[in-house]
UniProtKB/Swiss-Prot annotation:
The chain crosses the membrane at residues 7-27, 50-70, 105-125, 169-189, 212-232, 256-276, 285-305. It comes from Desulfitobacterium hafniense (strain Y51). It is a multi-pass membrane protein. One of its GO terms (cellular component) is extracellular region. HAMAP family: UPF0182. This is UPF0182 protein DSY1630.
């Protein structure tokens, strides 16, 4: 009975462990199925299971075979010794015969199963993707320059073969070594001499010899397998000058690998003969030969050739291989698709050219993202638990104008709740989502130096139809790290509203239903009984898991790499995240490695869209020609939709990804040089242009801009970055030599253009402009005056703006009090052109000082939503709220009468300004060119409606 009870307890424990493990799998299955991607759950799971079974079976064969062979060899050895000592004649007289019976066999099988499937369980999860890509490989249609194999062989097949080799060679080597050591200690192998090439050096019985012969034969077979594929791995070589196979690799290492392959073949033959013939040297001599040959052939030989032949004539010997590295690296990073154009950079900017470039000037980014984030937090945080994670740049057509917009979602920060409010009910049932977004125009600043909001407040309000939000709730974002339960008996907190709080219920379709069985499995998975004890949970309740959008997509498709900067867009009233996903490889031949991400091939093949409200995820194939994506589409049919399935309204918001652009810019520093001689001599290496951050120089980050490219008629959204020559401590060069632009609108999406400054033209780089700003006596005096105790000066990012064959440099200056909770205010704008630098209160004034012309830059677009129109959110107001609103607006207001009265006042002010201007001219004898015409002040004082909803006149100042 006791034995039966123990067995039952053991079985119960095993069952409990399996049940706990399966609870996690069950939760994953429910989650994948809820999103409609069950094949992303089943395909990897089944693949891993099959691989583990195959891997475990093969390892079991090796281990069990070895253990049984060791047992047989030792028993044979001991029985022979005992028979001699006891003088037993009959062959059936075996003193240790009983040891070979059932109990030992059972224990050997148990040990073999535990070791083999234990190792398989640990390693079997890692190789599933290599197996599936091997079975579904897509050719690149281009061969490598050495072995002429399709490039897909190196991306798909070779990693699979290397995985197989690594999975079995190590365990085989260990088993062989363990067997030799065990036989030696057991006395089965007796070394008569260390000179193992002699005939009588080793004494071994026949059973042990046959066992070792079999192990060594298989080991040589695998080593030969490895040597063969090592020849192709030479195209990843990092020895010598070239990344990839160089002269020494192909003329020394490759022959050495072929020689080792021959030795392995001889080892296989020798092992086979030793199995039948009592000659130990058939085993020892091949082992000795290969141990001596590996360091001599693979190490010393290439080193000698490199030193004596290659280095004295390095350029001559390595030129064809340098060309291979340049060509394939450029292909791997998409640099071969960059079109190059000359950018003269010496064309004078006139009033006519500036007038033509108004669309570009109207979108100059004056609001710097870093101070803007603080401003959003202080002005639009509303409550301490609302946080803005970062600022997203995008563009919208607003009232017929193409405008750059800076936008940040208002997410819920659980750690900023009062400690006493961080209860289970609040964290899981009550506070479930963020609310709305804040947006402002990139170039619009109020007279107080604050951003002009395009979307603001809670609930979100806007004057623009294109930015109307009908569903502002953010259940899935960048700061939503924990699960929540929705549709409980407890209403969810929606947003703060007066003395009370607005409440809501989740109406999305996603979420796992909390059925009794699901609650049981989730309780086991999360180690809590609250799924049963909480009275708020009912039959309609759902649990929302993996709400962080990056965790969400990485769990769905871990075989893709993702951009670090997802961005939110307003799409037909809903908030949607767009995440750039990459297909990558680190086994692309002859391609230089990008170390920060361990890759040497990358394509932005996929755009992922996540709905911020219900968490639905869609994968769209934007580069359907990419062979890696084509392979994934074979493995996971139906997961990746065609780009044509993406709504047109979303396609207009697709951006060229910043991470990919950084990678390409980094690689372009060297690989813009396509001539092997120039590349070898490093004659024209570049650096990313630098700017000052505090007092230290740092690389300029790529930035989005709406501008008109050279030879283009219309403004468009581009991502750009400037380059300067490479510098060192002895030779510091910071002039600009080129700038790279990525187009992203319409049919031009993804086009890369490299604009090169002629070598005989000297153009200031950003760091030079920063130095000139510091050296300007008036500017430096004013900044030093402000940057005293009680306040601090914040210098925004320096924006380099290519403009009509020249460059304009713009840097906003912010002033912030040192008091807690203070808001950075933009007080000045520094603009540089040629050898001139000015600092003014506004961008318009700075341009007027530089060029003597006052341009009529567009303010924020006029409102196109009636102030009396019902917003989408107002339909959700409670009856009492509606009554209050009605009472407040009982008295009718005629906007036209108000506007006419204001226009009369503006006209009076205009007359006063004209009189002052005439007096000024009489005193100075100077003339002011106002757009070259008579109606400068009229243009400068056009009436506009600002984002705050009030009517104001644009303040403009005359250039003294």
């Amino acid at each position: 009975m006791r034995r039966t009870a123990r067995i039952m307890l053991v079985l119960l424990g095993i069952g409990l462990i399996l049940f706990i493990a399966l609870s996690g799998l069950f939760e994953d299955y429910l989650w994948y199925s809820d999103l409609g991607y069950s094949q992303l759950f089943w395909t990897p799971l089944i693949s891993k299971g099959i691989i583990q079974i195959i891997n475990g079976t093969i390892l079991f064969t090796f281990i069990a075979g070895t253990l049984f062979s060791i047992r047989h060899a030792i028993l044979t050895f001991v029985n022979e010794r005992l028979r001699k000592r006891l003088r037993l004649v009959h062959e059936m007289d075996r003193p240790l015969y009983h040891l070979s019976q059932r109990k030992m066999t059972l224990w050997l099988i148990i040990i073999s199963v535990l070791i083999s499937f234990g190792v398989s369980f640990v390693t079997g999860f890692t190789g599933w993707l290599e197996v599936l890509t091997f079975l579904n490989a897509t050719p690149f249609g281009q061969g490598d320059p050495i072995f002429f194999k399709d490039l897909g062989f190196y991306v798909f097949q070779l990693p699979f073969f290397i995985t197989i080799y690594n999975a079995f060679f190590g365990p085989l080597f260990f088993l062989t070594f363990f067997t030799i050591v065990f036989y030696s200690f057991a006395g089965v192998i007796h070394f008569q001499s260390l000179l193992i090439w002699k005939k009588q050096a080793i004494e071994i019985n026949s059973a042990a010899r046959r066992h070792l012969a079999l192990l060594i034969t298989v080991l040589f077979l695998f080593k030969g397998f490895g040597c063969y594929f090592d020849t192709f791995r030479l195209l990843y070589s990092q020895h010598g000058l070239v990344l990839g196979a160089g002269y020494a690799d192909l003329h020394a290492t490759l022959p050495a690998l072929k020689a080792l392959l021959v030795l392995c073949a001889l080892g296989v033959i020798g092992g086979g003969l030793a199995f039948f013939k009592d000659e130990v040297r058939l085993l020892t001599l091949p082992i000795l030969a290969i141990f001596i040959s590996i360091p001599l052939l693979s190490g010393l030989g290439p080193m000698v050739l490199q030193s004596l032949v290659v280095i004295p004539n390095e350029l001559e010997k390595e030129t064809p291989y340098i060309q291979n590295e340049i060509a394939l690296t450029r292909f791997a990073y998409g640099l071969d698709q960059i079109s190059e154009e000359d950018y003269q950079a010496d064309q004078p900017l006139t009033s006519e050219t500036l007038q033509k470039e108004l669309p570009t000037l109207n979108n100059v980014r004056l609001n710097d993202p870093h101070p803007l984030l603080r401003t959003y937090t202080q002005k639009q945080g509303i409550r301490p638990y609302y946080k803005f994670y970062n600022i997203d740049m995008d563009r919208y057509w607003i009232n017929g104008e193409y405008r750059q917009v800076m936008l940040a979602p208002r997410e819920f920060s659980y750690q900023d709740l009062e400690k006493t409010a961080q209860t289970f009910v609040n964290l899981r049932f009550k506070y479930t989502h963020g609310f709305g977004v804040v947006a402002s125009f990139a170039n619009a600043v109020t007279p107080e130096g604050l951003p002009a909001f395009a979307i603001k407040d809670v609930p979100p309000t806007t004057d623009y139809q294109e930015l109307q939000i009908s569903q502002p709730r953010i259940y899935f974002g960048e700061m939503t790290h924990d699960w929540v339960v929705v549709n409980t008996d407890l209403k969810e907190f929606d947003y703060p509203e007066g003395k009370a709080n607005a409440e809501t219920r989740y109406e999305g379709k996603s979420g796992i239903k909390l059925t009794p069985f699901n609650r049981l499995m989730l309780s086991i998975k999360h180690g809590t009984l609250r799924f049963y004890l909480a009275n708020e949970i009912n039959s309609q309740s759902r649990i929302l898991l993996h709400r962080n959008i990056m965790d969400r997509v990485e769990k769905l498709a871990p075989f893709l790499q993702y951009d670090d900067n997802p961005y939110l867009v307003v799409d037909e009233g809903r908030l949607k995240w767009i995440i750039d996903a990459y297909t990558v490889s680190k086994t692309f031949p002859y391609s230089s490695m990008y170390p920060e991400r361990e890759l040497n091939y990358i394509r932005n093949s996929v755009k992922v869209v996540v709905d911020a409200y219900d968490g639905t995820v869609d994968f769209f194939a934007v580069d359907a020609q990419d062979p890696i994506l084509q392979t994934y589409r074979k493995i996971f049919p139906g997961v990746f939709k065609d780009l044509s399935a993406m709504p047109d309204t979303l396609q207009t918001h697709l951006r060229y990804p910043e991470t990919l652009f950084k990678i390409q810019s980094t690689m372009l520093k060297n690989f813009h040089m396509t001539d092997p001689t120039v590349f070898y001599n490093k004659e024209d290496t570049w650096d990313i242009a630098k700017e000052l951050f505090g007092s230290e120089p740092q690389n300029i980050a790529p930035y989005y801009s709406v501008m008109r490219l050279p030879d283009s008629e219309q403004p468009e959204s581009v991502l750009m970055i400037p380059f300067t020559p490479s510098s060192n401590a002895n030779n510091i060069r910071t002039n600009m030599v080129a700038w790279l632009a990525a187009r992203m609108d319409g049919e031009h999406y993804g086009e890369l253009i490299l604009y090169k400054v002629p070598k005989n033209t000297e153009v200031d780089g950003p760091l030079q402009v920063e130095s000139r700003i510091d050296q300007d006596p008036e500017i430096s005096r004013q900044l030093a005056l402000w940057d005293q105790k009680g306040s601090s000066v914040i210098r925004g990012d320096l924006v380099v703006l290519p403009l009509a064959g020249n460059f304009l440099y713009v840097e906003p200056i912010y002033l912030q009090s040192e008091k807690a909770g203070s808001i950075p205010e933009m007080k000045r704008v520094i603009v540089a052109y040629g050898d001139k630098i000015v600092m003014s209160e506004t961008f318009e004034e700075a341009l007027a000082q530089l060029f003597g012309v006052r341009l009529k830059l567009s303010p924020p677009p006029p409102a196109n939503v009636s102030a009396l129109a019902v917003s989408p959110m107002s339909a959700e107001l409670k009856p009492e709220e509606t009554e209050e609103t009605t009472e407040e607006t009982e008295e009718p207001v005629d906007p036209q009468e108000d506007t006419q009265a204001l226009l009369k006042q503006i006209e009076q002010i205009r007359e006063m300004l004209n009189q002052l201007e005439q007096q000024f001219k009489k005193i100075t004898g100077d003339s002011v060119d106002v757009e070259g015409g008579k109606k400068a002040d009229e243009d400068a004082h056009d009436v506009q409606t600002d984002p705050e909803g009030s009517v104001s006149s644009e303040q403009s100042k005359t250039n003294p």
